[in-house]
Curated annotation (Swiss-Prot):
This is Type-3 ice-structuring protein 1.9. Residues 1-23 form the signal peptide. Contributes to protect fish blood from freezing at subzero sea water temperatures. Lowers the blood freezing point. Binds to nascent ice crystals and prevents further growth. It comes from the Eukaryota. The lineage of its organism: Eukaryota, Metazoa, Chordata, Craniata, Vertebrata. One of its GO terms (cellular component) is extracellular region.
Length: 88
């Protein structure tokens, strides 16, 4: 009985973790000056509201420049990254 409860609890925790990571947005880990090319170290995934660029698309914006300064812990929005197009 205990193993069935633990298995069910593990399943619920995995589902919640999957849902939360799916709704993460890209957030700046540091101040990013205007016209700076983005690197992975400059960004992290975080659940925020309003949502910005999905964390799952972070690899698409690495190497692209920001068109304005981005503050530390600010959510990267699509209009902040030059030539960014959302995945379909």
């Amino acid at each position: 009985m205990k193993s069935a409860i633990l298995t069910g609890l593990l399943f619920v925790l995995l589902c919640v973790d999957h849902l939360s990571s799916a709704s993460q947005s890209v957030v700046a880990t540091q101040l990013i000056p205007i016209n700076t090319a983005l690197t992975p170290i400059m960004m992290k995934g975080q659940v925020v509201n309003p949502a910005g660029i999905p964390f799952a698309e972070m690899s698409q914006i690495v190497g692209k420049q920001v068109n304005r300064p981005v503050a530390k812990d600010e959510t990267l929005m699509p209009n902040m990254v030059k030539t960014y197009r959302a995945a379909k």
